[in-house]
Curated annotation (Swiss-Prot):
Protein name (database record): Enolase-phosphatase E1
Compartment(s) of residence: Cytoplasm; Nucleus
UniProt KW keywords: Amino-acid biosynthesis, Cytoplasm, Hydrolase, Magnesium, Metal-binding, Methionine biosynthesis, Nucleus
Gene: UTR4
Cofactor note: Binds 1 Mg(2+) ion per subunit.
Amino acid sequence: MAAAKKPRVVLLDIEGTVCPISFVKDVLFPYALSALPSTLAQEWDAPAFARYRAAFPAEHASTPSALAAHARDLMARDVKIGYLKALQGYLWEAGYASGALRAPLFEDVAPKVREWTSAAGEEGGVARVMIYSSGSVPAQKLLFRHTSGEPADLTDAITDYFDTVNAGPKTEPASYERIAAKYPEVPAGEWLFLSDNVREVEAAREAGMRACVVQRPGNAELPEDVRGRLEVVESFEEL
């Protein structure tokens, strides 16, 4: 690891990489489910809610109960689709604003992000940190604005955000090529992608990026063959 060339861009996954998988599964998703009925009852005809309702397929947006049933079904099956992600982000925004939600970053994350970005402009230093997650870009920004770090808001250190809408599926090499193409001044080989998902790491590598599997507490155990053929880290301090 130490001999690897320092990247110019670090591209970070979120769930299982910068925060525990359990935060999304056991905190964010249940919060959205619990907040959904009252939000639909109070805001169904509100202008601010109209675009979220309109994004759902017409057959599921005719009544609050129909939309709620469809949203619950999608969340139960962990379907990653844009209109659901947008609705979840809207629901989470209120939770973050009230203090009910706060993203529990692994303790090495905030210091390392600050270290990477403070090295901008130095020879061999990292100039940019970016995010690529299946969660919507607005939800990503909310998470990094309300973290357990000190200070809690990390958004000033993050240059750009990508999701499955503006970049594409995370297991397809073309998505990483699309991300890198937005910054043509940085060759793909000078990007470092960090994720707990082996298929995502393989896709990024196929697109020419350096990529590492991040093995965090609570993540599924990695097969031995993965450790033999891919870079694996347990903390950003190893980078």
